[in-house]
């Protein structure tokens, strides 16, 4: 596909006009709060930033009092937020315009299905493809829900601006409404006073389902089937997209995730989807006013109508309405039953009363009876629309909404299994045994001994009790809400086969694993570069065990593997991580093929390039050919969720991109000469080995690097920011390796170095180019012909464009000694070298030369939110001197929020 991206067609003039209006409203609101004299300083800061008079700007900010800092920090934090809204509104407008006028754009579903339909196995491809965005609550979503609600109001008002210009909406009323919400934002706390709880995170993410995701997913699948039907394909129960959830089940490094939070997550999701069904059935009740005087119904619908408690005389001749009333009553009873009885299985007793549905399938069957009755009695015109979409929603969301993943660190499983084996007098020192002996013991317990190890009366440790409670809750959830409510358990830091069998032992304890099947799929997560390298041999051996073959066969021959982008990047740098992931996918796919197993990948990507982020379409289509069979899962993290799914139009577009990119990659083999590809891989091996050494020499080999990072970034302030339930580190931070990848990347974004997205790239390429004058031409050829390499370098280009070494230099001044400051000199040299080399390989004269949309976006915002960095630096200085006071420390957090908002992909 060579069609342009939809974003590239955004109306830049319209965005600029709207930003001007929003800026004036913010200016007026600020003047009202502080007066013209104080506001003049804000005007001066904007002028100095635009003119790039950095030293003068820094001096002026140093003169601000703490009280003046409050308003200035808020102003420059809110301005990029308003710019984001304008861009999102225009993207939504462009999406609707392109679709309504049947204009093609990159990733458009109709064009993609046209492409797939030409394949010999098109029916199989279209029927089986499944993309799963998994929403997570990593600590990168810095906005309060209150602020999100207010911005949604502004978003909706801005959508109406074109009507205002056309004169169909009163301009003054529109302006007054907009001013009110801007003033509300200016006077609302931007950050949270208290750290989020897991239950808060669950509730927050449900807002996206209510506002956009349920409708977006349902609409997309309905359209997908319609377009496929036009091409002659009947897809039946195809689910090209389903949703996943980590919140409530991801306890790796998060002690606040328990059996109770897992249950709450499932029940909250159940409540959300049941309420959606109730509302939709209510809509159908109002719509289906068909009278028996004018139409006929089936006996099955008549029986439903007769059981309805709607006894109004006005309904005597409206059996469809009575049938929908009966269905709605059963849904309400289901909701009440699950709320009151929690995870007890649904029971049916007296057939005369309104009883809860025992399953989503039972609910669907009732809807199908109505559809069948309409088809049989000349009512086919009433089927399309709400009824069809509701049936589709039930197929996708069931009574569970999104499948919850469980995740835990492998060391926790080992600790628990060691305790179980010791308490059952099987082996006293399991953890000390060599790998072969561990596997032998675990296999014996899994294949030969049906007993439950935890049944002994020996007192259990707190960690074992907690883990067993979670697994027992998972079993109850599956029994009550269906198998799909929890399908995977991920093992962080998978380093051996025993890591996977240890989880199997824990699952066996609660009846989720036996010799024939695993009701919860065991998913290894390979994170570091070393683990990725070792993953081939681990999986090659694991797939050959008879019990594993049975588990996989019971799972339709699929085995999922999760790939960690964040830790591999922190471990070896951007190039090393990207190449290790690429090779691992290639080789793991081949291992699966050799064993008759479909290996599917779960991509643990973050919002930033340093954590595997970047444009979703390009990321998926640049995966190794053959690595996407028909299923792919990927995490959607932090503020990326809000950016992608904050409103229904943009949500639909991003879901469409995921499905189209996956289908495109499944059927399109980008032509790369096989001999060339072998050569390309050898070149990458050489460059990556060099890049890894350069990266690790600084991060882990330079004795001053640790001190530099903690002095020249707001890492301590980020760690104390109330932006998620998870701690910033698994333990007390004494070295870089102990820091979680997310705050690591977040902090480098704040000081504008964007270190994880490019360091080690420039020198490695330069060394290769200097070896032979023809090597630059080879790299340019690779960039033009190899999608993986093109995507890799395009992401570096994007990261460099968001970095700012002038600002980074000011952060470096926060270091206390010259040796530590020298670390920045090394970073600066590498940054300049990387920029030069990337431009040379791309044959470009400037960064973002082929990304006009992002370039325009940065042009709007950079002059304004650059000011925030200088404010943040001054605030950090004052805090470290003890001059801020406890009541003003949150000012730093406000600036952190603003920078993250301006960059739009903080972690």
Swiss-Prot record:
Forms oxaloacetate, a four-carbon dicarboxylic acid source for the tricarboxylic acid cycle. SUPFAM superfamilies: Phosphoenolpyruvate/pyruvate domain. Keywords: Carbon dioxide fixation, Lyase, Magnesium. This is Phosphoenolpyruvate carboxylase. Its cofactor is Mg(2+). The keyword Lyase applies. The active site is at 138, 570. The keyword Ribosomal protein does not apply. InterPro entries: PEP_COase, PEP_COase_bac/pln-type, PEP_COase_Lys_AS, PEPCASE_His_AS, Pyrv/PenolPyrv_kinase-like_dom. Its EC number is 4.1.1.31. It holds the Pfam family PEPcase. One of its GO terms (biological process) is carbon fixation. The lineage of its organism: Bacteria, Bacillati, Bacillota, Bacilli, Lactobacillales. Disulfide bonds: none annotated. One of its GO terms (molecular function) is magnesium ion binding.
């Amino acid at each position: 596909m060579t069609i342009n991206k939809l974003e590239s067609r955004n109306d830049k003039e319209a965005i600029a006009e709207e930003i001007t209006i929003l800026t004036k409203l913010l200016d007026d609101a600020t003047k009202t709060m502080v007066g013209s004299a104080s506001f003049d300083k804000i005007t001066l800061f904007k002028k100095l930033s635009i003119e790039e008079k950095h030293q003068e700007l820094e001096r002026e900010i140093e003169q601000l009092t703490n009280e003046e800092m409050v308003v200035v920090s808020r102003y420059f934090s809110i301005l990029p937020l308003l710019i984001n809204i304008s861009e999102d509104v225009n993207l939504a407008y462009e999406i609707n315009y392109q679709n309504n006028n049947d204009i093609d754009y990159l990733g458009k579903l109709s064009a993609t299905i046209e492409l797939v339909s030409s394949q010999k196995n098109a029916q199989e491809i279209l029927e089986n493809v499944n993309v799963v965005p998994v929403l997570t609550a990593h600590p990168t979503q810095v906005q309060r829900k209150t602020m999100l609600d207010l911005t949604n109001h502004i978003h909706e008002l801005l959508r109406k601006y074109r009507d205002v210009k056309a004169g169909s909406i009163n301009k003054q009323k529109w302006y007054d409404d907009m001013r009110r919400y801007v003033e509300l934002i200016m006077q609302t706390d931007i950050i949270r006073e208290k750290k989020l709880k897991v239950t808060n995170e669950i509730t927050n993410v449900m807002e996206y389902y209510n506002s956009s995701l349920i409708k977006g997913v349902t609409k997309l699948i309905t359209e997908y089937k319609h377009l496929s039907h036009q091409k002659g394909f009947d897809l039946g129960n195809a689910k090209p997209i389903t949703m996943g959830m980590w919140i409530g089940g991801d306890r790796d490094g998060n002690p606040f995730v328990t059996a109770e939070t897992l249950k709450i997550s499932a029940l909250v999701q159940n409540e959300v989807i049941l309420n959606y069904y109730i509302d939709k059935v209510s809509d159908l009740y109002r719509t289906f006013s068909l009278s028996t005087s004018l139409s006929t119904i089936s006996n099955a619908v008549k029986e439903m109508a007769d059981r309805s408690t709607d006894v109004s005389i006005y309904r005597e001749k409206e059996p469809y309405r009575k049938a929908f009333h009966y269905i709605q009553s059963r849904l309400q009873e289901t909701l009440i039953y699950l709320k009151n009885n929690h995870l007890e299985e649904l029971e049916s007793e007296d057939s005369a009363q309104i009883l809860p549905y025992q399953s989503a399938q039972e609910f669907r069957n009732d809807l199908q009876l109505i559809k069948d009755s309409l088809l049989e009695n000349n009512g086919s015109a009433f089927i399309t629309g709400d009824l069809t979409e509701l049936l589709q929603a039930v197929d996708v969301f069931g009574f569970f909404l999104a499948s919850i993943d469980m995740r835990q660190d492998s060391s926790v499983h080992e600790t628990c299994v060691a305790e179980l084996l010791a308490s059952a007098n099987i082996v006293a020192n399991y953890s000390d045994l060599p790998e072969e002996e561990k596997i032998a013991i675990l296999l014996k317990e899994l294949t030969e001994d049906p007993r439950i190890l935890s049944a002994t009366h020996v007192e259990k440790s707190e960690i074992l009790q907690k883990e067993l409670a979670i697994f027992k809750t998972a079993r109850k959830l599956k029994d009550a809400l269906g198998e799909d409510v929890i399908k995977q358990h991920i093992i962080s830091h998978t380093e051996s086969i025993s890591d996977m069998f240890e989880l199997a032992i824990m699952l066996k304890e609660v009846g989720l694993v036996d010799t024939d099947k695993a009701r919860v799929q065991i998913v290894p997560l390979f994170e570091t570069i070393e683990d990725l390298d070792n993953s081939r041999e681990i999986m090659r051996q694991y797939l050959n065990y008879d019990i594993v073959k049975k588990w996989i066969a019971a799972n339709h021959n699929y085995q999922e593997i999760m790939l960690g982008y964040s830790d591999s990047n922190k471990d070896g740098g951007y190039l090393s991580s990207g190449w290790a992931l690429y090779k691992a996918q290639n080789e793991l796919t081949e291992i699966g093929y050799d064993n008759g197993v479909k290996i599917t990948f779960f991509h643990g990507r973050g919002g930033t390039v340093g954590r595997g982020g970047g444009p979703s379409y390009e990321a998926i289509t640049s995966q190794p050919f053959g690595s996407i069979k028909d299923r792919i899962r990927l995490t959607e993290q932090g503020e990326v969720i809000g950016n992608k799914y904050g409103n229904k139009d943009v949500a639909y577009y991003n879901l469409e991109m995921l499905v189209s990119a996956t289908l495109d990659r499944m059927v399109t083999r980008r032509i790369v000469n096989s001999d060339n590809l072998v050569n390309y891989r050898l070149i990458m091996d050489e460059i990556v080995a060099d890049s890894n050494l350069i990266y690790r020499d600084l991060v882990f080999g330079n004795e001053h690097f640790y001190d530099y990072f903690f002095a020249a970034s707001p890492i301590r302030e980020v760690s104390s920011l109330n932006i998620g339930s998870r701690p910033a580190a698994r333990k007390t931070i004494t070295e870089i390796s102990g820091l979680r990848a997310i705050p690591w990347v977040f902090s480098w974004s704040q000081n504008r170095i964007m270190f994880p997205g490019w360091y080690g790239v420039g020198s490695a390429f330069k060394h290769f180019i200097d070896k032979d004058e023809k090597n630059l031409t080879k790299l340019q050829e690779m960039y033009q012909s190899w999608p993986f390499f093109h995507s890799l370098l395009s992401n570096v280009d994007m990261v460099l464009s968001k970095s700012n070494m002038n600002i980074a230099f000011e952060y470096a001044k926060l270091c206390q000694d010259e040796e530590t400051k020298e670390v920045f000199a090394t970073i600066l040299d590498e940054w300049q070298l990387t920029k030069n080399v990337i431009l040379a390989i791309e044959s470009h004269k400037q960064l973002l030369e082929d990304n006009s949309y992002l370039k325009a976006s940065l042009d709007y915002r950079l002059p304004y939110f650059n000011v925030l960095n200088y404010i943040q630096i001054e605030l950090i200085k004052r805090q470290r001197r003890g001059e801020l006071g406890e009541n003003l420390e949150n000012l730093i957090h406000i600036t952190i929020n603003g920078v993250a908002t301006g960059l739009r992909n903080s972690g």
